């Protein structure tokens, strides 16, 4: 007998791992009911992942579930929010119980890893896609937005850039992971780390923040447009991993870093006088952050300008991923 929607949910997704006092009503009713702490605001984000647009048909259900969760939590991290709850809308072409079992176990394990509770969702038949709505909370009026960059701010990025795009390139070419560099790059694509603790550490010192989902050029451009300013970025300051430099030349590595996307690192700005405070806060975290440029007065459009050793250079490759432009 074919498994129905409610049987599927009950068997695979109603295995609540966490006991969460903030959840008064969860899976099994028309809505979930949750409580937000006093003097905090609710932060909400939604992302959809569609097969052949956001992920390859060859991705494992374990990696797909992890990445679907992590990319949503990354949005909350950029706001400085504490992730708390998610709902899942899962569209499946058919009911493959082995696939669903593996996917659900990975999803619930990932949620437990980040202390997040699944509180509801929906399933339907169609081409494979995953939509997750993630919710969290941030102290009232303390959320880090995109529109408050100030002239003179220093621009920082976390960890290293371009690894995900380099890993995806290897996967698209059918390259097996034959050494530690390959493993590192491919895992950076399949298993990004949402910088939740970093986002919270930036509250009170960062003017703006964004997670790098579409590439540095594109995502920094969002900050510049919302903040009505321009920026200079020093290419020699871009943090590149030893793995990407072992596998690609510097020019290709920079291209991955600037326009590859899906690094899910944080890009943020702080006023220069908070530089020491930032370094102090970073000592408590295992996440290096690198200053790559500064915010300037608006000049021309909102695309960042690039320097190499302090001298202006032109960037000729793509600015980043855009769902609709890429489909034309």
Curated annotation (Swiss-Prot):
Residues involved in substrate binding: 54, 262, 321
Positions bound to Mg(2+) 2: 47, 75
EC number of this enzyme: 2.7.4.16
Catalyzed reaction equations: thiamine phosphate + ATP = thiamine diphosphate + ADP
Amino-acid positions noted as binding Mg(2+) 1 in the UniProt annotation, renumbered to this chain: 46-47, 122
UniProt binding sites for Mg(2+) 5: 214
Miscellaneous information on this protein: Reaction mechanism of ThiL seems to utilize a direct, inline transfer of the gamma-phosphate of ATP to TMP rather than a phosphorylated enzyme intermediate.
Protein name (record): Thiamine-monophosphate kinase
Organism, as annotated: Haemophilus influenzae (strain ATCC 51907 / DSM 11121 / KW20 / Rd)
């Amino acid at each position: 007998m074919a498994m129905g929607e409610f049987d599927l949910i009950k068997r695979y997704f109603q295995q609540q791992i966490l006991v969460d006092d903030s959840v008064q009503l969860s899976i099994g009713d028309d809505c979930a009911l949750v409580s937000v702490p006093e003097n905090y605001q609710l932060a909400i984000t939604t992302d959809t992942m569609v097969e052949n647009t956001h992920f390859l048909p060859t991705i494992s259900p374990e990696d797909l579930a992890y990445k679907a969760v992590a990319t949503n939590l990354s949005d909350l991290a950029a706001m400085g929010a504490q992730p708390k709850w998610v709902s899942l809308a899962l569209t499946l072409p058919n009911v493959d119980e082995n696939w669903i079992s593996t996917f659900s176990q990975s999803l619930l394990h990932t949620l437990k890893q980040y202390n997040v509770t699944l509180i509801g969702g929906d399933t339907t038949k169609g081409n494979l896609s995953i939509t997750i709505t993630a919710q969290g909370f941030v102290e009232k009026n303390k959320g880090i937005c995109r529109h408050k960059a100030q002239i003179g701010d220093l621009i920082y990025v976390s960890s290293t850039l371009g690894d995900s795009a380099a890993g995806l390139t290897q996967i698209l070419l059918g390259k097996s992971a034959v050494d530690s560099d390959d493993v590192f790059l491919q895992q950076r694509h399949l298993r990004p780390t949402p910088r939740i603790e970093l986002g919270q550490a930036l509250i009170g010192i960062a003017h703006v923040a964004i997670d790098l989902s579409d590439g540095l050029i594109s995502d920094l451009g969002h900050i510049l447009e919302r903040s009505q300013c321009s920026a200079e970025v020093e290419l020699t300051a871009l943090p590149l991993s030893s793995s990407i430099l072992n596998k690609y030349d510097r020019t290709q590595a920079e291209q991955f870093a600037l326009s590859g996307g899906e690094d899910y690192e944080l890009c943020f700005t702080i006023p220069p006088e908070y530089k020491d405070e930032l370094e102090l806060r970073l000592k408590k975290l295992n996440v290096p952050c690198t200053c790559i440029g500064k915010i300037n007065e608006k000049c021309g459009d909102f695309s960042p300008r690039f320097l190499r050793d302090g001298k202006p250079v032109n960037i000729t490759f793509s600015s980043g991923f855009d769902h609709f432009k890429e489909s034309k």
